[in-house]
Amino acid sequence: MADPDLDFASGDAGASATYPMQCSALRKNGFVVLKGRPCKIVEMSTSKTGKHGHAKVHLVGIDIFTNKKYEDICPSTHNMDVPNIKRNDYQLVDISEGFLSLMMDNGDVREDLRVPDGDLGKEIENKFAAGEEMLVTVLSAMGEESAVALKPMTK
């Protein structure tokens, strides 16, 4: 009856990676897609309506995965895409060959995330080497995932 080749374990419910929101409704510290990248809004300003046209919204955002800065200007009445962002905490179990072994709440272990570059990656490796029990916060948006934060595990 069941086809053994079908595996639905990693499927989603067909939810979109983004949803539309009017430019004027966006807020600082919110999220938006700029130049095709999921960004956190760090600066936002509006200009008055001109003789011809609408009020404009000037957005400056930092990519949540690469920390690159992106800017865009759009009319306040237009819709912008806002990324659906999921934030999960996983227990750090092991680090091997540049990949994190992370245990989920249900006991499953995932080993598909790289140790992040920069200071966070060094901090994760140092604290793990010192034997500290840590929770790694993983952000996922638009088909990408990355470890973004580290916190001590509560006893």
UniProtKB/Swiss-Prot annotation:
UniProt keyword terms in alphabetical order: Cytoplasm, Elongation factor, Endoplasmic reticulum, Hypusine, Initiation factor, Membrane, Nucleus, Protein biosynthesis, RNA-binding
Principal location class: cytoplasm
Bilayer topology term: Peripheral membrane protein
Source domain of life: Eukaryota
Coiled coil region boundaries: none
Biological-process GO terms, alphabetical: positive regulation of translational elongation; positive regulation of translational termination; translational elongation
Location(s), subcellular: Cytoplasm; Nucleus; Endoplasmic reticulum membrane
Entry-annotated residues carrying Hypusine: K51
Presence of keyword Signal: no
Entry PTM: Lys-51 undergoes hypusination, a unique post-translational modification that consists in the addition of a butylamino group from spermidine to lysine side chain, leading to the formation of the unusual amino acid hypusine. eIF-5As are the only known proteins to undergo this modification, which is essential for their function.
Alphabetized Pfam families for the sequence: eIF-5a (PF01287), IF5A-like_N (PF21485)
One GO cellular component term: endoplasmic reticulum membrane
InterPro entries from the UniProt entry: IF5A-like (IPR001884), IF5A-like_N (IPR048670), NA-bd_OB-fold (IPR012340), Rib_uL2_dom2 (IPR014722), Trans_elong_IF5A_hypusine_site (IPR019769), Transl_elong_IF5A_C (IPR020189), Translation_prot_SH3-like_sf (IPR008991)
Molecular functions (GO terms): ribosome binding; RNA binding; translation elongation factor activity; translation initiation factor activity
Subunit architecture: Binds to 80S ribosomes. Actively translating ribosomes show mutually exclusive binding of eIF5a (eif5a or eif5a2) and eef2/eEF2. Interacts with dapl1/dap1b; interaction takes place at the polypeptide exit tunnel of hibernating ribosomes and prevents translation.
NCBIfam families documented for this protein: eIF_5A (TIGR00037)
Its job: Translation factor that promotes translation elongation and termination, particularly upon ribosome stalling at specific amino acid sequence contexts. Binds between the exit (E) and peptidyl (P) site of the ribosome and promotes rescue of stalled ribosome: specifically required for efficient translation of polyproline-containing peptides as well as other motifs that stall the ribosome. Acts as a ribosome quality control (RQC) cofactor by joining the RQC complex to facilitate peptidyl transfer during CAT tailing step.
Family: Belongs to the eIF-5A family.
Designated name of the protein: Eukaryotic translation initiation factor 5A-1
Gene name, Swiss-Prot/TrEMBL: eif5a
